[in-house]
């Protein structure tokens, strides 16, 4: 091997293509140095390209100048957006697809084609073309158009070389291939929130396509052709395809461009198949990515593609399954039912669930119980997707496994039957059109419980549901149960009628009890009033017997009546008894001189009345008195 390596290096050094290209590169470097000396502003221009641009809103200008700058900034963004792939996505959301660190260099020169050289010189020419492909350009502007064309042509020629080459390649070419792939592919993706604050929604917004896709696509093709080539040596490639390479590739799955995610899916599957030592690390990295998505970020663009790769990986698991794989199912895959973006990857997640049930049927119980526990109560669209997944998985479950979670399943189905959202109820009732599900329900062990659980909601739906199609489906479901076992159906219907009558009787009793306390209260009030009246009459009789002397003076109207338990004030009684009208007072004043003798008679008469009233009201304090 050492001798071959030395001979290979000697051949490369003696190659006329390499020598000519070296001379060309030296000349280009000298020209660049002269240009930089003559134009010192050119170097500043390259340095300026690496500085991140600020929006006009972030720079303190005067208002008129600031408005002008904002208009120019928006026009530049629109131009970049059109160059990046047309009218894809919202202009307010993002302006650039990805961020490359462009290398300042001159224009690339075209190298000879593979057809123009001998087969022995093609590996060295392939190495030169790979070096040319390591230059990265910004596709948001129209600069370096010649170099972009030269690079794209070199990439296409590399693809053709790898598809036709049947000779083993040297380790230096392995290093150069993966270096070129890393330079072109591994880049920071744009943030989800731009300065305008609008977030990308994968379900509603159109994705912004990658501006540099003409080059990136061919780079992916080079990598795939290189890994799939019959002369590919994993022992050499494992020095360059390591854990860091895998992590950087998994980070690219968050790209908005679906074309890139499709290539990443294929590439990751090839790496998993070729590099046996990386399989455990790839599964661990996928587990960490899923856990971050479920419990932290809740946003990722490539979950569906990763699950598709994972489905093929699970398909290759050996039976019986390892505890590691079972824990991966319970702690990583099943929690993927929680996020709101479940509709994006539900089909691939359901396929992974079905693969685990096929590999080990005993996993059906934890899978179904977990899905029923994570059932979305407030999201009708997600409920419909859950019902579809349940239908697919029930086709793989045996009668013995179904008996372990049938109670939870039947309870959830009754809730879905009675749902006010007609799509949920309709999708749940369509389960009875699946032969596998009907066979599970119609078995001897499950039919009695199923009919007892389903009869009431189906009967109520057939009568009172607001949607006509739901009423018709409920009636057809009842007919299906009737055809399976007529006798049992009649028994359960009679039980339902009896329970309905009992409920009506209970409701009537409750209404009667609610009205009964009101009548009892009215009776008690009447009795209390009667008792009070009797007590008042008795007290009056006692007072009349004890005060017989006052009854002789019935000529004078009584001025008082019972009112409260307070004692009687003699001064009040005297004031009331001595009350006279205004005419009497006026007449007394006018006749005061003539009636001096009568004044003594009046005072004596008033004192006699006061003494009589005091004697009449010498009663206990507990008696009630009022004044009229």
Swiss-Prot record:
InterPro entries given in the database record: ARM-like (IPR011989), ARM-type_fold (IPR016024), PP2A_B56 (IPR002554)
Molecular-function GO terms, alphabetical: cAMP-dependent protein kinase regulator activity; GTPase regulator activity; protein phosphatase activator activity; protein phosphatase regulator activity; small GTPase binding
The listed locations are: Cytoplasm, Cytosol
The biological process GO terms on file are: cell differentiation; cell motility; chemotaxis to cAMP; chemotaxis to folate; meiotic sister chromatid cohesion; response to curcumin; signal transduction; sorocarp development
Q: Which GO terms describe its cellular component?
A: cytosol; protein phosphatase type 2A complex
Query: Where does this protein chiefly localize?
Result: cytoplasm
The record's keywords, sorted A to Z, are: Cytoplasm
The record's section on Gene3D superfamilies has: Leucine-rich Repeat Variant
Any Pfam family:
B56
- Composition-biased stretches, type Polar residues, lie in 1-22
> Per the record, which residues fall in region Disordered?
1-61, 500-558, 577-628
Upon gene disruption, the observed phenotype is: Null cells displays higher PP2A phosphatase activity compared with the wild type, around 10 hours of delayed expression of ecmA and ecmB prestalk markers, inefficient culmination and higher GSK3 kinase activity.
Give residue spans, biased composition: Basic and acidic residues. Answer: 600-618
Biased composition (Low complexity) is annotated at 23-58, 524-547
Its quaternary organisation is: PP2A consists of a trimeric holoenzyme, composed of a 37 kDa catalytic subunit (C subunit) and a 65 kDa constant regulatory subunit (A subunit), that associates with a variety of regulatory subunits (B subunit) such as phr2AB (B55) and psrA (B56 homolog). The trimer may partially dissociates into a core 'AC' dimer equally active compared to the trimer. Seems to play a role in proper anterior patterning (pstO and pstAB).
Family, according to the entry, reads as follows: Belongs to the phosphatase 2A regulatory subunit B56 family.
What is this protein's function per UniProt? Involved in developmental cell fate decision.
What name appears for this protein in its UniProt entry? Serine/threonine-protein phosphatase 2A regulatory subunit psrA
Originating species: Dictyostelium discoideum
